[in-house]
Amino acid sequence: MLTNLHVKNLALIDEAEVEFGPGLNILTGETGAGKSILIGSINAALGKKISREMIRTGETSALVELVFETENPHVLELLKEMDLEAEEGQVIISRKITGSRSVCRINGEACNISQVKVLASLLLDIHGQHEHQTHDVRQGKTPGRIETVAHAGAAQQRAEIIADGLA
């Protein structure tokens, strides 16, 4: 479970600390409050590409640190394979981004992005708004059945098309 997020000098964030509790955690707020930056910082720490331009204006580096608590045997075994220890089930993943490179660490030990990505796949799932949808009506990208239903003239035809799709 992700218990803590620390972000420093990333985008508009000078420094931020977010504590997470057990169960579902939801970020809400006004437009422009920084929700996307927080999610982006988590993704960056977990190995996603991040532009150097995301470093806060006037700063030379940005830092994102995630703290996890886990008893997952797969995570603990993977850490052993990487010659890393998880004291009391705590895993700390950090990434420092500078103008020329980024450095990842797991529990204080330097590692590569691929190691972080493998570990991250066992620790966290992030689901954003509309990720479950398979179409984008605004851009005209819709599955064939939806287009067919939209253009069917009679209610009976629409019902048959839907029934066929469910069969």
Identify the role of each PLM range:
Residues 4-166:
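Gly/Lys-enriched N-terminal cap/neck module of very large, oligomeric protein machines
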